Amino acid sequence: MKREDEKINVWGARVHNLKNIDVEIPRGSLTVITGLSGSGKSSLAFDTIFAEGQRRYIETFSAYARNFLGGLERPDVDKITGLSPVISIEQKTTNKNPRSTVGTTTEIYDFLRLLYARAGTAYSYVTGEKMVKYTEEEVINMILTAYSGKRIFILAPLVRNRKGHYRELFENMRKKGYLYVRVDEEIKEIASGMKLDRYKNHNIEVVIDKLQVRDKDDERLRKSVETAMRQGDGLMMIMDKDSGEAKYYSKRLMCPTSGIAYGDPAPNKFSFNSPEGACPRCKGLGVVNLVDQSKIIPDDSLSIYEGGIVPLGKYKNQMIFWQVGSLLEENELSLKTPIKDLPEDVLNDILYGKIEKVKIRKEVVHTSSDYFVEYDGLVKYIQQAIEDESNKEAQKWAEQFLTECKCPECHGGRLNRESLSYKLWNKNISEVADLDIKDLDQWLTDAEAHLDSKNKRIAEEILKEIRSRIHFILDVGLDYLSLNRQSVSLSGGESQRIRLATQIGSQLVNVLYILDEPSIGLHQRDNEKLIKSLKDLRDMGNTVIVVEHDRDMMLNADYIVDIGPGAGRKGGKVVFQGTPKQMLKQDTVTSEYLNGRREIQLPDHRRVGNGKSLCIHGASGNNLKNVDVEFPLGKLIVVTGVSGSGKSTLVNETLQPILSKHFYRSLKEPMPYESIEGIENIDKVVNVDQSPIGRTPRSNPATYTGVFSDIRSLFVNLPEAKIRGYKPGRFSFNVKGGRCEACGGNGYKTIEMNFLPDVMVPCEVCHGKRYNRETLEVRYKGKSIADVLDMTVNQAVEFFENVPDILRKIKTIQDVGLGYIKLGQPSTTLSGGECQRMKLATELSKRDTGKTMFILDEPTTGLHFEDIRILMSVLQKLVDRGNTVVIIEHNLDVIKLADYIIDMGPEGGRGGGQVMAVGTPEEVAESGKGFTSRFIKEELERVR
């Protein structure tokens, strides 16, 4: 019999739809929690076990500290025992900060900064020479050797290439007793009131001494060098009096030719989040927003009068048009001249302004007069609007004319030129951070071999830390990422695996880890590595709980908890808990898919499509290798390939933005491509993702699908409503009139509990029904509007069977497998998979033209085998209507149902970006090209 502390026991869990369940999970195991979408998996793993672990941790804080923290709410559970400290690793890409990168998240970049600060070699950003550094004694010996017997000036640099009159500086030097300065390579006596041209750049050195170099024991030389170093902040200059040649010497890192000096390198110098290291132009972001001429003039066949310059619009009797008109008249042109016929210099004057003032003629009652005004150009006007923080409306207007470009100063390196001048084995830190992780691993090996013995000793421990973290990232299948990759650009699965690698690297023990589908976005090729990583985490002495649907993950687990049997109200029970071996003998939905008794069937035939296609030529964004890709229309298309092979770049970053820009004038710019053909063969594009369908509890399936408007119209037309003169707004809980004013139509009240979490209690007036008594008195078939919102979709289908407009919309919700959810259920409680299917239901309810392209990125995220079967049947219906569905997917249950596959590869990152194979699943399987073909072949053989 197991001891109590060898397992995690959950008694009486009732969070969301959980039916007072008891669960036992062995400690030190890899446990998979599985079940249909909406069955209660996340409610058990995250909202019960993790929430209680988090609450216990926060309870250790003082009451004062708890006042500033959320997350104290106790989950609805009787008791949980055996909990360790809990760490949750979810799919959500929570970090939207553009400064967060793979390198900063994994802490590899922190160690890399330390490596460059301790072992990097500095080079001059002016000449490219290696920087030098001397002690005072070495400087004196070098002067004695180089200038023996010569007369020299000893100078201290004060100003380097800066504007100003410097009157105060000269006066200060004069008061200190100095008689001469060298200004712009000319020795001058410091006169009272001396000043320079304030608008020119100047170099100023103060003359510390002039002497003849004699022997070693020259005390005067020694003291003068010491003073010069002090006045010049570690930098000094020696000038030969006869030849006028000058040479720099420094106690700091210095360029022997130009004299520029660097401070001693510290790790902060290599941080783009620190003022010491960040590029001054882009502030460490690597990109800047610049005004894009193609957005200002999208159609140069139009004239300015016709609105050819978008920021100006069509002609108006305003000063800006008078100024532009005068510019054109000077060149014998007019506002009605097509922009393409304007000379380049005239167009530049209009966009960027003119140095000379513009002459404007003002005519008043048969008399005219000329006056001159300054004209700064449209681009400057747009830039001023962007910089004006006080006028958000003008900022938003100006943003449409900007394009994000690489910073022209650091060229995307994020750091200032001094920081980018430190190198290790011919690469600066930004170049190293741009390498794929697998290339970085090789570079570290090569760099270490080229270090001298002193630096090798210094770098040994740092390299060890970097390497261990790199290997953890390689183990979770992310070898194609670079350290400079922004966290915000990672998919949910990538983001989660990065955090997983970071946790493995932290070497914590006796911790409970809870992960949400770590296999999402991972090709079958890399699945084994991920499972090994999770087992390594377990073998360190941790307990790992994974919410997962992946077949291999379940079969490799130590323990499985299956929640079901259905979803929503029909779920929330433990249908099985035990080992995978025991699971295969059960008759649950999950076990039947695992042991092959139930299967997602292959289609009888592959569609031939409508004979038309959409072709992208020369796609070269990110790692795409100038590829030409054809999307045959009227088919179910699946884009496959290993992680990082270019699938998302092709579909989400190239295809979708092209279509969105064409149909909806989207501001998102597509990745580079040469041309697109066949766009006339479709009439719209719809992206069906798993993002929430509403951000507040007021949003619900009825409002999202639009069926609530029809339901309110039905109630308005009832005799009782007509007698009372009710309008549709009477049946809305969002506006005054029909809603309960005591709770504002929420159905509950929030009670603030100071340092305890806020408590939500049902409204004592409407008892959670949201409406006032008078509104609830209007009934249809004995049900009030509140009763209708409390119905499940299945109940509503029966209830409204005689109302075609309402039935059509709610029937599609039922058809996508969401019959169990309530019409008035808050959108915030729906899972990602449920949100996605809700969006599909909305599209299905529309009367489409059969020329729509639907785009889905990994729609199987969070979906059980049975959910995938339902989802795919919905997508097949969309294609049967003549539409085209494009899916990015790794799941073989989806891939095998495709009419057409586009397989990207062969590897991820720089090794990818090519089209490996296209055609039906059978054709791709037989091609033998790419990694996907082998897995498709095995899957087709398994199901036949």
Please place each PLM-identified region on the residue numbering.
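Conserved phosphate-binding elements of NTP-dependent enzyme cores
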Residues: M1-R944
